[in-house]
């Protein structure tokens, strides 16, 4: 199981690196969005605005990045993978790959924000931990949605239509607790909310793991 998951993650990195334009398109989107925000606010930006713009840019870049999760397994290749890999291993490998991808994307977005808009992060450790939880929860939901989209002939509208409502509960909680990491963070006070976020990410992961085999056999 572990070997199969590792090979799936490795294969995804190799395939995506062969088509580097997907990586570069995400980087260009982040750079252009943050730079536009910089021009609009002319360096005068509050912590609340910094936080809101960060999550808006991150969630849309995450949707765009995860859309390609099953780009290489669509159509007839689903039958080939069905005979070679267990669906549970496949979805876990995809989720791990997307988690690493999204976490790197979030770090790059925060770095660009800090460079252009100023460093508003008061507690770096808390912010990085919150971003990790966000990447895990987003990757689980978006990977499953990408699988549905692949089964529907890679309809480009489905990921945005399905994922935004599913991500909304996590996004609201994330934006609130991440704002506290900008203005002043206490681990003791925010521990219950962090536990809720961790449980939401875990539930998203378990649902993707349990439901994907049924989608795979369809």
Show the residue positions of the predicted features.
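Transmembrane helix boundary and interhelical loop/hinge segments in multi-pass membrane proteins
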Residues: 16, 63-81
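Loop-to-helix entry region at the N-terminal start of transmembrane alpha-helices
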Residues: 43-61, 189-197
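Terminal transmembrane helical anchor/hairpin motif
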Residues: 161-162, 166-218
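A structural motif at transmembrane helix-loop-helix junctions in multipass membrane proteins
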Residues: 132-164, 216-218
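Aromatic- and glycine-rich beta-strand/loop motifs that create alpha-glucan
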Residues: 1-25
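Hydrophobic alpha-helical transmembrane segments of multi-pass membrane transport/permease proteins
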Residues: 20-41, 54-60, 162-173, 199-208
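Selective transmembrane-helix segments that form parts of the transport pathway or gating/packing helices
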Residues: 87-114
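Membrane-interfacial helix-loop-helix connectors in multipass membrane proteins
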Residues: 42-45, 111-130, 178-194
